[in-house]
Amino acid sequence: MATLEQPYLDLLSKIMSEGHDKEDRTGTGTRSLFGAQMRFDLNDGFPILTTKKIPFGLIKSELLWFLRGDTNIRFLLEHNNHIWDEWAFKNWVESNEYQGPDMTNFGLRSQQDPEFKRIYQEEMKKFDQKVLEDQTFAEKYGNLGDVYGAQWRHWQKREGGFIDQIQNVIDQIKKTPYSRRLIVSAWNPEDVPTSALPPCHVLFQFYVNDGCLSLQLYQRSGDMFLGVPFNIASYALLVNLVARETGLKPGEFIHTLGDAHIYKNHFNQVKELLNRSAYDAPMLWLNPDKKLVQDFEMKDIKLINYRHHGTIKAPVAV
């Protein structure tokens, strides 16, 4: 086993020292670099951060959600996963049907105003509960549009019908493993305006060599403190699942980023993280009785010997 997160820590440090300060869509402000890359050898363990606790259950449920082709947060809420809540909640509070307290700019306001934060949390709790209990409401306001699950599994064709990119690429890996077309794309320009959040991890490509399966991800935009650690673990898990179905060994995960940024209200958290010492990476366990990607459930995926530091909380920029 080895310490796998050093490329991530090095990139955080580089952005803090060499990054460009910019304004951004959320109004928070960032420090960013353009065109960064991290490489993780999956033979050395599973690349989940140890310098802070990463809730692996959230990563599992989100990836399984994508792989189901699901775009409704109801499945996530059933697994106590609130990663995507804010995006669905935004659709609700901006609708004509919403009659509650003013939730304009709820992301920033909840950070600055304790009383508003309390009201916001109450409204969010009511929203989540209604998504879980009311099927009609869930279909209307729990759906995030054509996000990852839709593009991966149900890419709409102009002439009608859809393309299942995940099944297609698995079939290609089995039949023509040395193809240079082992690609899945989540970026559909026609759907970008109607998505709750246009895809950040835009495209990934598989590569087979010496019986090993590697994957390179291109991510157009990466929230380095909150989002990217999840993306690293999620795509490392995806490589392992696809390798299982295709009879290959996991090779390398290469993470290429366009705008790799740290939000200004995460600077203190980043400094705290960089002062911590990393532990050895854990190992990934997959149920040996499962082979097909579509058959895996939460209980079939576990981390062994995941030793980590404590959680570091930081606000989400919406």
Swiss-Prot record:
Pathway(s) of this molecule: Pyrimidine metabolism; dTTP biosynthesis
Residues that bind (6R)-5,10-methylene-5,6,7,8-tetrahydrofolate: 223, 317
Name of the protein this chain belongs to: Thymidylate synthase
Catalytic activities: dUMP + (6R)-5,10-methylene-5,6,7,8-tetrahydrofolate = 7,8-dihydrofolate + dTMP
PROSITE patterns in alphabetical order: THYMIDYLATE_SYNTHASE
Sequence positions that bind dUMP: 25, 180-181, 220-223, 231, 261-263
Sample GO molecular function, one term: thymidylate synthase activity
Annotated transmembrane regions: none
Family affiliation: Belongs to the thymidylate synthase family. Bacterial-type ThyA subfamily.
Pfam families: Thymidylat_synt
Keywords, comma-separated and alphabetical: Cytoplasm, Methyltransferase, Nucleotide biosynthesis, Transferase
Originating organism: Lactobacillus johnsonii (strain CNCM I-12250 / La1 / NCC 533)
Subcellular location: Cytoplasm
SUPFAM superfamilies assigned to the protein according to its UniProt record, in alphabetical order: Thymidylate synthase/dCMP hydroxymethylase (SSF55831)
Known function: Catalyzes the reductive methylation of 2'-deoxyuridine-5'-monophosphate (dUMP) to 2'-deoxythymidine-5'-monophosphate (dTMP) while utilizing 5,10-methylenetetrahydrofolate (mTHF) as the methyl donor and reductant in the reaction, yielding dihydrofolate (DHF) as a by-product. This enzymatic reaction provides an intracellular de novo source of dTMP, an essential precursor for DNA biosynthesis.
Domain of life, per lineage: Bacteria
